Design a protein with these regions (language model features):
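Alpha-helical transmembrane segments of multipass membrane proteins
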Residues: 46-51, 77, 135, 169, ...
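A generic, lipid-embedded transmembrane alpha helix
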Residues: 70-79, 102
Length: 182
């Protein structure tokens, strides 16, 4: 017998179980759509960690850049400008201009996150990268938004953040083992 949805009544999940199943599906899909970007970012994280320490940044400074800036392109620009002897304001302005593209990314995603609370929007915007934008914009375009779709977005953000910082740490370690990287 069906409950009117086409799903046999015996197979229908209770609301809480259905919610958990949908949440799990969102998290898994967030990982699935982000994984190719994680693979692509890995060598750049290693290179950044190795080059930054080779340029004279302390390993904690290098790790802090990845932890708090979390913008590979800005981080590479920053270490390049540091190597050239640029001042702090020059580095700040260059990385700000470079990252202005994120305002366009954010504007494109507003229709999908507008309904979320301010704390949710803050966390998602703080983790907005080229990769998370590409993954989520494509997903939202294909599937639209629904009650739990922001969990796929959060999974994309967290997985890219952890991925970038893991590979940066590996690069810091590897860079300390290889001489002549300057």
């Amino acid at each position: 017998m069906s409950d009117g949805t086409g799903v046999p009544a015996a197979a229908a999940l209770p609301p809480a179980a259905s919610h958990r199943a949908q949440l799990r599906a969102e998290v898994l899909d967030g990982l699935k759509i982000t994984f190719p970007f994680m693979v692509g970012a890995a060598p750049f994280g290693v290179i950044f960690g190795a080059l930054a320490t080779a340029q004279g940044l302390h390993p904690l400074e290098t790790a802090s850049l990845s932890l708090f800036v979390f913008s590979g392109s800005a981080q590479f620009v920053a270490i390049s400008l540091l190597a050239l002897g640029a001042g702090g304001w020059t580095i700040w302005l260059a990385t700000l201009i470079l990252n202005l593209r994120h305002t366009l990314y954010a504007a494109a995603l507003v229709p999908y996150v507008r309904h979320l609370s301010l704390p949710w929007r803050f966390v998602l915007s703080a983790g907005l990268t080229d990769e998370t934008f590409a993954a989520m914009e494509d997903r939202y375009r294909r599937l639209g938004k629904h009650e739990l779709s922001h969990w796929a977005y959060l999974t994309s953000v967290v997985s890219m953040y952890l991925n970038w910082n893991f590979w940066t740490a590996l690069g810091i370690f590897a860079g300390s083992q290889v001489k002549g990287l300057e």
